[in-house]
Amino acid sequence: MALAVFVCGVIASRPAGATDTTPLTGDIATAARAVEAMANPSAVNPLVEFPADFNEVTNRKPVVVTTPDGTKRAIDPAGGCSGPAGDTEWDFGPGCRAHDLGYDLLRYAEHKGRPLNQEARKVLDARLARDMHAQCDINPRGHGTRCHATAQLYAAGLEFNSWRQRWGPPGHEPVLAWGFGSAVVVFLLLARLPGLPRRKEGDREPEPSDTPRPRVTNDRYATFLRLAALGLVVLSQSLLTVLHWAGVSANWLWLLTWALQAIPVFYFAGGHANLTSWHAVQADHGGYGRYLSARISWLLRPVLAFVLAWLVLPLPLELLDVDKSRVEMFGRLIAYPLWFLGLYLVAVAATPVMAWLHRHARLVTPVALVAVMIVVDALRISLHWRTGGYLNLVLGALLLQQLGFHYADGSLHRISRKVLGALALTAVPVLLALITFGGYPRTMMTLPGEGSSNLSPPTVCLLVLGLAQISLVLLLRPRVTGWLAGHRQWRVVEYARSAPMTVYLGYLTVLAAVIGVLGLLDAPAAFDWVATRPRWLTVLVLLLLPVLLVFHRFERNAALSPSRTRETHRTRLAVTLGAGYGVLGVLGFVVTGFAGAAGTLLVFKVDPLQNLIHLLLGWYLLHTAHAGTCHGRRPWLLTALACVPPLLVLEPTGAMVVLHGATIAAALLAAIPKQYQARTTEHRQPRPALQHP
């Protein structure tokens, strides 16, 4: 476990490599020739190959020395070996100083705007390895074997560090943040290993046998809608990809996206489930902490398994010499759809507040959300306001969830079929008018070859389409409900219902393997591609089965552990921080991918290692609230510890300092034991907890 997590941390900390393959020119070409001269020393002065402004740009003053073999070497007098023994007793110093100057050439090229390719750093590292072994032959000092072993150790450490930096320009990295962060990842996982204390007896609420628990109302049609919408998202992405391979033009595919875009229906049906669960928790005398810990824990668990798997996967891919640019594209491709889950976590967390608004302002709330979305969309277009797109994502999810609330309380059932039909039919001319005269994109999903879509970022067109889809599903409700009354049909739905996230994440896994590993999108030949390569069909089937089994195990185990804990201020703090950091981790991977490149999520500067820590911290805090261990001191001390690595980066942003500093302060306060906590627990009248619906 610890070894796997360490590998995750190493891979997550790796920066993205350079991918520019255009010919070198000017000072960059001169720097490349200088590197070549450094890697192949001769009797010629290598400084004649250096760029004219090298000393000024790098603030270095290289000198030339003559080695015992008669070659001239350019060195950095201030350099030296960075190993634990320094230049060593065999004097590896000249080779290390020449190597340091070669690294300065790599930094010079990066400063000029065009990093040299991987081969430049590889030849410099190989030159240093040969120099150290040559020094052992020239001056073994009576310990030739030990000298060669030391040289080999230095060379291995050098190669590992270059591999970790993707053989790109060497830079000053937050090694302390990386090492501390990897340790925190290990601690967060070890805190959940079997055999460790889970909860105190005083934290568990007894379950009286004579007190019945309230049951969640089961709307078969709403359950079917959630699963069908999720399945349609899967099928639509696969279908559009296959059609693109077949060479179908985007001029035809855009119409298909109108019928296949099912995300609005999913959030609509999810709103019904969220409101029903919240009401059930309230009826069971529970609160926000119990609701959120039960509702989000089962979502984050399979997501965490998915992320850990895909953080480790680039290692064997690179060992198999898979093209680096493809691995990086692969990481971003499989991480991007996680926004769908991250946004759903936001909607789940906002349910209690939105339910209060639904109770006190039933009609005003959705109308206000629509108005704000229209204003934000107009500002986004006119001011090129990128953040407006993110804001509309959240507002759109909350609006569709709010409509799901109206379905849950029966309000939408009172709308006549004629009105629903008119709304559905009116959407078509409205969409055509918005696309023709409003300048909106014509596609409702991202398509290859299309510059933009109404999904990324979400626009008014997606809102109109969502309202039309909801009208259609309400029209179909009586007929589909009758069909779902059949025993066989409902058994299929119940089986899929037990692990909906497993289906979604399993699909992402297989899609990523097809596109990223096999590189199908790089060379779409023809529609008969699958038929001409039957061996890949076998590979995909063998890949799909274990993936689904593993993810299903994570999700099934999470669903079988209902909450039986008392709810306190610590519980509510744990679930609030857990949900927030869980969303930050999931959406952070959407921005950065798994390839090691940093990115910006709103005002937060994130990288894959920070994303992993945030996701693990969110999962851990939600688990402590669910299991009742958040009343102890250890979870809060570990929470404070987990917030330290983001503060150790070279240039932490103000937003990250405020977020993690405030979390550390809150965690340390929560770690202080209360004087009368035991007495409060002893006199509290326990109530039965609600099992997750």
Please place each PLM-identified region on the residue numbering.
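Extended terminal accessory/targeting regions
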Residues: M1-D210
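Hydrophobic alpha-helical transmembrane segments of polytopic
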Residues: A2, A222-L232, L256, I263, ...
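Alpha-helical transmembrane segments of multi-pass membrane proteins
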Residues: F6-P15, L232-L243, L311-L315, Y581-G593
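Sec/Tat-exported extracytoplasmic proteins
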Residues: A85, D100-E110, L128, M132-N139, ...
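Individual transmembrane alpha-helices with interfacial aromatic-anchor signatures
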Residues: P170-H172, P337, T532-V539, T653-A662
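Membrane-interface capping segments at transmembrane-helix boundaries
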Residues: A191-D203, R479-W483, V550-S563, I672-R684
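Alpha-helical transmembrane segments and their immediate juxtamembrane cytosolic regions
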Residues: P206-R566
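Membrane-interface extramembranous regions
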Residues: R566-L690
